[in-house]
Amino acid sequence: CDEDGERKLDVRIEDGVVTEIALDLSGGEVIDAQGAYLLPSLVDTNIRLQDSTLNAKNIKIISDEAMLGGVGHIVLNADSNPAIDNEIVLEFAQNGLDNLSGAKVDLMLNSLKEDATLSNIAILLKKGVVAPYMSTIAKNNIAIKIAEYVQMYKVTLFCKAEDNSLIKSGVMLDGNVSSKLGLAGIPNLSEVLHVSRMIEIARHFKIKILFKAIASPRSVSLINQAKKDGIDVSCEVSIHHLLKSDKECNEFNTTAKLDPPLASNEDMLELQNALKNSQIDCLTTLHQPSSPVNKEVAFYDAAYGCEALSDALPLYYTKLIRSGIISMGELMKLTVSNPAKSIGLKKGKIEVGVKADFILFNPKTTKFVQNTQSLYNGEELNGEVIQIKT
């Protein structure tokens, strides 16, 4: 199965490349995949390291975890510690990436330095980062300069829509649940206002923007209207915002403290409808692992994020395919073709001539999630990822 849908065929692979696709091929070593899917490995462009700490050990761990979940290519967020906003940190992060045995790891650059000045975007792009990242806390004059670089180098701008003046001390969605818990909330407008602003910048400069981890249906609506107007914008939504609501924060459950915050139940259902109607372009696990010392504390003090990377494909399959929300072919577009396109790659098809970056997925097995930092801890998932050597 690839972005074009499911079909029952044999695939011949020689020297890591697909050389033939047909019924009843013979000769050579045979892998019996009866009852399983042959899939392109997934791509996830919104991954953070343990405690957002950038070092070789954490990169290796995340690379190996990704493969367990069927994810063969990840892009690390740039707002790590240290942030990828200068040549020294970039070279430090790149050292050893070619020697990883797990998923391929790429890097994005942080367009803003800690002092809110512009990083050297041109140099960092030339040295191998796949995309510039920008939070909309950037003032308009800085955002416009970033857009000019994006226009010049013809890359996709990864944009997180948020407003510092509205976030303030907020730790979850502003709504009934936050009021009941007595926690400061973050209004949807924090995201929506800046999606609208960045759409206008994309229109003016004719640049590509991928809005990262969108949580509001209104933002999705604005982005899709912009697409109809010919503006090259797209949106990514996390699996958690499609399946879980802010009710998960009840009893001060710090695993449900995410950035962006989980939406209301009504908005979660609207996001599901947007997915069914092909209004969402990319999916992410929004994987952000934290040490227990940073999670097993008061909700206000807890780190943001949860874990899902090692369960990625079984999670997508169980919650989206078996439930009938989308098809397997559509999942391949959302988790392979479109994310790959955002970093300048062409992936998502199984056809003659392509590199055999594939996995096998057996949908008939089941397992229970055993991870206290997962929102799905204790839930049963369908499917097992099987690595194949090509």
Mark where each language-model region is.
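Histidine/acidic residue-rich metal-binding segments in metalloenzymes
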Residues: A116-L283
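Divalent metal-coordination and catalytic microenvironments
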Residues: G16, G35, N46, A66, ...
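Active-site mouth loops of central-metabolism enzymes
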Residues: T45-K57, A103-A116, A184-N188
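Alpha-helix-loop-beta-strand connector modules within alpha/beta enzyme cores
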Residues: E87-K104, Y149-C159, D311, L315
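Metal-associated gating/positioning segment near the N- to mid-region
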Residues: A33-L97
